[in-house]
Regions:
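Nucleotide donor/acceptor-binding cores
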Residues: 108-110
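Short beta-strand segments
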Residues: 15-17, 112-116
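Surface-exposed amphipathic alpha-helices with a cationic face
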Residues: 1-8, 100
Length: 139
């Protein structure tokens, strides 16, 4: 985000966070609230600490998505788009869709979604029907 905003301050950086992580509330209020910390399963996003590497000054908005929505979106990307991506990618796309629902975009807006990982580490989880059923993600 920093690199892009330094080149074009008009760019909006949208962060994706897991429900149960502290990022969204901290971003919105500046308060680290331990009551926000809840178990979540999506790997690669969210946290129960505020690491020194995250620069909130370059983030414009944070969207939270839950594990089920992220997992189902991950599977949808593979089935419908042919993209064998990881769970955090499903979260990124689900978060982008949620952002679009909550914010008006115009015809000139361009959205770029970073898909940070491959699906190879999730064959036994998100891409496994039995595991998905055990988590209550497949009805």
């Amino acid at each position: 985000g920093k690199y892009l905003k330094e080149r074009n301050p008009e760019i909006k950086v949208i962060g994706i966070d897991s429900v149960g992580s502290v990022y969204k509330k901290y971003f919105e209020t500046g308060i680290f609230d331990k009551n926000e910390i809840k178990p979540y399963m999506t790997e690669g996003i969210g946290e129960d600490i505020i690491p020194g590497t995250i620069e909130f000054d370059y983030i414009d908005y944070i969207v939270q998505v839950d594990d089920k929505v992220s997992a189902l979106e991950t599977r949808s990307l593979a089935k419908d788009e042919g993209l064998f991506v990881g769970w955090s990618c499903g979260a990124a796309v689900a978060g982008a869709k949620k952002y679009i629902e909550e914010n008006r975009l115009n015809d000139n807006d361009v959205m770029v979604i970073v898909l940070p990982d491959s699906g190879t580490r999730y064959i036994g989880k998100v891409y496994n029907d039995e595991w998905m059923k055990e988590q209550g993600f497949l009805d």
